[in-house]
Structure formats: structure tokens, C-alpha cells
């Protein structure tokens, strides 16, 4: 992938950009095999990759510069701002949005937040696109509600320029820390969620719910999990750390009983909406801590699917699963190091199948799907 920002030394986020994709995949596969070297693996499936540029469905832009000439991008470690509107990871559809946002920031008088001085209002611009219908969600992260009335007043101009903006919100993040969002979300549009479609499964994206940033690879990840589950004798499963329900909604059949657990209320609202649309009445989604939910249960289903954050599922959940011994565990991980550590804590299981998903090209990161079978 060619990137003028990288070539000019202005951005180093894509550290592997100079390596061809096949080389990147080889290095990631070697890393994964090294991490799982202590465990016999029955089947290594071929790694899955997607487009090498224009694949991201989300931009998280730090706003800096002045109200008349805002910059959208990032701050270097020394505080120097960098405009990243031309980043080739973003699809072409983002360019007109960035182009309209810059004059809009001036029109609405949204002074960029100055980290050094702790002054200003506009901290971040968060933009998400649904690939299924091209609808977009735009979030203004502000320090306070001081400029909210001005923003509302100027908004019709922006909406006229960009009819693809279906969901627009203001998020209030009052703390002087590098935190992307606060708890308060103020909707400026009637529509409150975007719909995305992967493999004919509707998935909803709300402002404060996590959603995979690489739709091409994420849709293949969910489809693969569905195919693996279809091959197993499973009538009851748990989907722990389920997010908006991507895995559970793909894996469920009309006669399957499924419980999805996720701590984030917004994500659970999305999952419930999808299940209702699909007419899957035996799916139950609850906003709870996944570990606390599981360890309080006196029995387990045949299959437990886990998709934890980078820290992994942790010892308490590993101990519980070892004791209760579901027949199958499917582990989806964005951090193979913690996954390998967790598998060590599941001594009664063997690795049936492993597949790498290149969700984050040009970086060392990747996603991995592993099927564990009780010995």
C-alpha cells in the first residue's frame, strides 16, 4: 500500500506498510504458531485477509489547529498535530465528509480542544459507515455542553451537504485525559443506530457499542464461526463478551437455545434488535459481566463461545470452564498471547482447529479463531 503520510515520515501507525501482504501474513502465522507451540493443533486453516486499503469503516480523529483551520487526525507524542484526512485506510466515501466538516467546525464555532492549555471544546470527531447502505454516524466529542446550541443551529447546513449522515450525536467528555468518549450521549437526529449487514444478518451499530473496524474480514470471521458451529452437535450455546451479537446471531438456528452476555447496555440493545428482526425467539441477550454470569451458573451448554477484550478471559472463567467442562469452546481473540495463556488454564481441552484473520493489515495485530474440544 502506498501512503504519502508514511513516506513523508508524518505517520508511523502502519509499521508493516513496507512489507507485501503475503509477507505480513507469514509473519503473523509464524507468531501464532510460536505462541501455540506447546499445544498440538489438529488443523491449521489458511489465513483469511481482505483489502489492503480503504477497508476501515471507522475514523477516530483528534481535532486540533484553530477554529478557522481545524486539523483532523492525531497528535504526535510531542503534541504536534497531524492531519490524517488522506489516510489510505479510509474508504473514498470519507473524503467528502472530512472536507465538509472543516468549514462546519468554523461555522458552528467549535473551538478545537488544546491539550497543553486545557482550553477549547471540540476534542474528537468519530465517523462510522455502514457498508450495506452507505449510511453514516457522526459523533462530536465535546468537553462540555457550552457549544451545543451553536452546533444545533449550524447543523442543517451540514445535513444538506451530507445527506448520508443518518445518525449525529454529541458526546460529552469533560475529563482532561486521552479518553475517546464520556458517558453522556446527546442525539441530534431521530435515527439512533446504523444497520450493517454481514452474510444476510442485520447488525446494529449504536454510538457507544463496539463494532469491528474491518467489515470485509469481520464478515468472514462470523461466517467461519457459523460454519464451525453447524458441524457440531449443539442445541444450546453461550456467547460470552458478545458485543452487538455478531457471533451468536450468525451461529443461532431457529431451534437452538442461545444466551448472549455483554456488559455494555448499548451493544445488548443492538443484539436484541437484530434477534427480533431475524425472528429468533430462543435467543436471550443480557447486559451482565460475562465472567460473573457464567460462574454463577450450575450447568453449562454444549458450546461456550468467548470473544474477550485484549486481556483474555482470565483465570476465574478458565477455572470454571475446566470444572464444568462444556464439550466445545470456540475462542475468538484479538490478542493471541492472552489466548495462549488462557488455553494453558484449560488442560482438559485439545485444539481441533485454528484460523488467523488479518483484521489489521500493516500492523502486527491479528484476530484468531480457535476450536477447543474436551478430551
Swiss-Prot record:
Keywords: 4Fe-4S, Iron, Iron-sulfur, Metal-binding, Methyltransferase, rRNA processing, S-adenosyl-L-methionine, Transferase. It catalyses: uridine(747) in 23S rRNA + S-adenosyl-L-methionine = 5-methyluridine(747) in 23S rRNA + S-adenosyl-L-homocysteine + H(+). GO terms for molecular function: 4 iron, 4 sulfur cluster binding; iron ion binding; rRNA (uridine-C5-)-methyltransferase activity. The keyword Ribosomal protein does not apply. It is an enzyme of class 2 (transferase). [4Fe-4S] cluster binds at residues 3, 11, 14, 87. Pfam families: tRNA_U5-meth_tr. S-adenosyl-L-methionine binds at residues 212, 241, 262, 307. The active site is at residue 334. InterPro entries: 23SrRNA_MeTrfase_RlmC, MeTrfase_TrmA_AS, MeTrfase_TrmA_CS, SAM-dependent_MTases_sf, U5_MeTrfase_fam. GO terms for biological process: rRNA base methylation. The keyword Transport does not apply. Its EC number is 2.1.1.189. Catalyzes the formation of 5-methyl-uridine at position 747 (m5U747) in 23S rRNA. Belongs to the class I-like SAM-binding methyltransferase superfamily. RNA M5U methyltransferase family. RlmC subfamily. This is 23S rRNA (uracil(747)-C(5))-methyltransferase RlmC. It comes from Escherichia coli O157:H7. The gene is rlmC.
Amino acid at each position: 500500500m502506498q501512503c504519502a503520510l508514511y513516506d513523508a515520515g508524518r505517520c508511523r501507525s502502519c509499521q508493516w506498510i513496507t512489507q507485501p501482504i503475503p509477507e505480513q501474513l507469514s509473519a503473523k502465522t509464524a507468531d501464532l504458531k510460536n505462541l501455540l507451540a506447546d499445544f498440538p493443533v489438529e488443523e491449521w486453516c489458511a489465513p483469511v485477509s481482505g483489502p489492503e486499503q480503504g477497508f476501515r469503516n471507522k475514523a477516530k480523529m483528534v481535532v486540533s489547529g484553530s477554529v478557522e483551520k481545524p486539523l483532523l487526525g492525531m497528535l504526535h507524542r510531542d503534541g504536534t498535530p497531524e492531519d490524517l484526512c488522506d489516510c489510505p485506510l479510509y474508504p473514498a466515501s470519507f473524503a467528502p465528509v472530512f472536507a465538509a466538516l472543516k468549514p462546519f467546525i468554523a461555522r458552528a464555532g467549535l473551538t478545537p480542544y488544546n491539550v497543553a492549555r486545557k482550553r477549547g471544546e471540540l476534542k474528537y470527531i468519530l465517523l462510522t459507515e455502514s457498508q450495506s447502505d452507505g449510511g453514516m454516524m457522526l459523533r462530536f466529542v465535546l468537553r462540555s455542553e457550552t457549544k451545543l446550541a451553536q452546533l444545533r443551529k449550524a447543523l442543517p447546513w451540514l445535513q444538506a451537504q451530507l445527506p448520508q449522515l443518518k445518525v449525529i450525536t454529541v458526546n460529552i467528555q469533560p475529563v482532561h485525559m486521552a479518553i475517546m468518549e464520556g458517558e453522556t450521549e446527546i442525539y441530534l437526529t431521530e435515527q439512533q443506530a446504523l444497520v450493517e449487514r454481514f452474510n444476510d444478518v442485520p447488525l446494529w451499530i449504536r454510538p457507544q457499542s463496539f463494532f469491528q473496524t474491518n467489515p470485509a474480514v469481520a464478515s468472514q470471521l462470523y461466517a467461519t464461526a457459523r460454519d464451525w458451529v453447524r458441524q457440531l452437535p449443539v442445541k444450546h450455546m453461550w456467547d460470552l463478551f458478545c458485543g452487538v451479537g455478531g457471533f451468536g446471531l450468525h451461529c443461532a438456528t431457529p431451534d437452538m437455545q442461545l444466551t448472549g452476555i455483554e456488559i455494555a447496555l448499548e451493544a445488548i440493545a443492538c443484539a436484541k434488535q437484530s434477534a427480533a428482526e431475524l425472528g429468533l425467539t430462543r435467543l436471550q441477550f443480557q447486559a451482565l459481566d460475562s465472567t460473573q454470569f457464567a460462574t454463577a451458573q450450575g450447568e453449562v451448554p454444549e458450546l461456550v463461545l468467548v470473544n474477550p477484550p485484549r486481556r483474555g478471559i482470565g483465570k476465574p472463567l478458565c477455572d470454571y470452564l475446566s470444572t464444568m467442562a462444556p464439550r466445545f469452546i470456540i475462542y475468538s481473540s484479538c490478542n493471541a498471547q492472552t489466548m495462549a495463556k488462557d488455553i494453558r488454564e484449560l488442560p482438559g481441552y485439545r485444539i481441533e482447529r485454528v484460523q488467523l484473520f488479518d483484521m489489521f493489515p500493516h500492523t502486527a495485530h491479528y484476530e484468531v479463531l480457535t476450536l477447543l474440544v474436551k478430551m
